[in-house]
Structures are given as structure tokens and as C-alpha cells.
Amino acid sequence: MGNVENKLRVEDSSIHDWYRFVLSFPPHLVQQYLETFCVDQTSFVLDPFCGTGTTNVECKKHGVSSWGIEASPLTHFVSKTKCVWANDTFNFLNTAKQIALAAARTINSLSKPRTLSEEQTSLILKNSICEQPLSSTLVLRDSIRAANSPFEDYYLLALAKHIVYSYSNLKFGPEVGISRKKKESVDVVEIWLSEIERMETDLEYWKHHSSTFADISLGDARSIPKRDYIGKVDCVITSPPYPNEKDYSRTTRLESVILGFINTKALLLHHQLF
């Protein structure tokens, strides 16, 4: 397996690129393992360190049932959302357009920018995000939640992706750092809505496998939750974490704070233990 190219191929990007780590292993590696181990639609696959759900999404694309376990609340949210494929794509897109209009109106009427609390600000890297993109992101986040939509998780996932890659000053090489070139002005809502349109296209394309089973558990793989699944597992495909080398919470810190997965130093310390 050493000759497998370690990057996301364009032809594999649908759903996987809704949100993924810079260090994620590529979907075609999972494809190769499924073939090598003769995994078919009667099989049950486990990824005990599923991260952003590469194994589980790829299994679902192939009609293979799977189970993932993830200790981080943010990445659990990511992988769980990526593994539930909505069928009502018409309302999915229309609701997003309504949210975008509401957010844009609020942004245009603000008398002063919205900010994080002092404690929240202390949790993120200094200069992670500039004032205008942050303010607009907070407005859009609140507009998404105010809509009380069944598609809320998808909308927040799209926001999480672009907090990192379009709105912030973060760079990955592969460790997270701050770019010298700052993004002072960003059309947060337009970028987000474009992402929703891409997600809608993916959901429409893959709807024939929307019912394929995929369950993502929040927990520590060392104390297995949902033990009733254990006897069903035919194959394990995973990439174990390297806790002595990587602080995974640092990589996802900004979006975790903005979306509320981490809002105190105590919670941050807890996440760093995994």
C-alpha cells in the first residue's frame, strides 16, 4: 500500500471535501483496502479513530455499512454529518438561501461588529481571524441556528469548513500557524451559500446510497461504546492518532470555539487529553 498517493483526488472529492483535515488519509486508500480485503455490501467496517469520516463516507459510497468512533466533539460532529445524506435537496437549498438573505440583512444593519467573549478569544490563536470576517461569521452562525432547520448540521458544517479555509488567517504546513497575509474583508455569506450549493449537488448525486448504514459514536475507542456492534465487525480500516506528536485540538481550535464545541479553558484541557 506504500505506493498510494496521499492526497484527495478530484474524482473522490464529493462529500469528503465538505470538511477534512490536511493530514487525512485519502479516500482511494479506503477504496483499495475494500478491494484487497474483499469487503462487499454484506460486510460491516469499523474505524475506531474515524476523525472526519473518510473511511465511513467511502464505505457508504460503496453501499457498505460502517461504524466510526471519534473522541473529539467537533470531528464527531463532522463525520456524523457527512454520513447522513438528506434526500430533500430542494428544501435544503431553498432554506439556505433564506438564511443567507437574513444574515446579509443583519450584517448590513450592524452598528458595531460582533465579537467573541474574552474567554473565547483567549482560546484561539492570536490573529486567527480578522474583525469583519469574524463578525459576519457570528451573524451567519446565529442566523443558521435561528432558522431551526432540519438541515442545520449541514449548514454549520459548511460554515466550519470556510471558517478555516476562507475566512481565517490560518495556514497549515502541516502544523497550524498564522499567515502573514491577513483576510481583512470576506464575503462570508456568499462563500457559504456557494458551499451549500456544492453540497446539494453531492447529495443529489449520492442519494441512491443515502440509506446505507453508517453510525458515528462519540467516545474513546479504548472503552468501546455500543458494544452490540462489536460482533458484527468484519474489517477495521483506520489511522491511529499520535497523541505524543500532535495536539489535534489546536488544528480545529478556531471553528470549535466559534461553533461552541469549546468555550472554556477547562473544556479545552479535556479535549487535549485525547
Residue ranges: model-predicted function:
Residues L134-T238, P243-T251:
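SAM-dependent nucleic-acid methyltransferase catalytic core
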